[in-house]
Amino acid sequence: MARRARFSPRLHIPAARAALGPHLHFPRRRLVLRHCGVRAFVGDAIVSKKEMTNPLCAQAIVFGNGFVETYVRSLDPRLLGAYHALSRPVCERPLFAVRGWRRLFPIVARRLDAVERRTRRVLRSMCRTYTTCMSADRAAAVSHPVMRRRWFGHRATKTRRARLRRRCRNRSSKRRAERRKRFCNYCP
């Protein structure tokens, strides 16, 4: 039997990775919504059979903020790539692989459509919130010339004020400044 090109037998097992943060990791996430420059993703790391029917999480990529998660308990399983019937185990043939499943199971199709509409509404409102914040940040950055450099990181700000601001960040930089003062007779 021909399998999918990117089939993984461990698809229903959560992605075990080094903890890069408190967020869930989605190995093959898919884009479900693009709104005002913010892209919303959902992934296919399914933790359990229960989560097939009641998935957990959606992500949005926000410029400058990285990944942002919304934990939505009632996401559509089709969006997560689970492609399984409402209460079927992993080994069975998925409902969405059956030809004409919408006609055969109209109640399930209506329920899933309603869930998908609600999910997209949540994601759209989330994206709208983030684009509003981003446009406000961008307007503030354009109006304030010192803040505009922050878009390029602190290395672009080679001014004395930025050096002083960086110096008070951590102990090692304070120690280096003390050494410079002592040995080079130098005060930044």
Swiss-Prot record:
Recorded superkingdom: Viruses
Keywords, sorted A to Z: Host cytoplasm, Host nucleus, Host-virus interaction, Inhibition of host NF-kappa-B by virus, Virion
One Gene Ontology term from the biological process aspect of the record: symbiont-mediated suppression of host NF-kappaB cascade
Subcellular location: Host nucleus; Host cytoplasm, Host perinuclear region; Virion
Primary site of residence: host cell
GO CC list: host cell nucleus; host cell perinuclear region of cytoplasm; virion component
Role this protein plays: Plays a role in the inhibition of the host NF-kappa-B pathway early during infection. Prevents the host RELA subunit from reaching the nucleus and activate transcription.
Self-association state and partner proteins as the record states: Interacts with host IKBKG; this interaction inhibits host NF-kappa-B pathway activation.
Protein name: Protein ORFV073
Highest classification ranks of the organism: Viruses, Varidnaviria, Bamfordvirae, Nucleocytoviricota, Pokkesviricetes
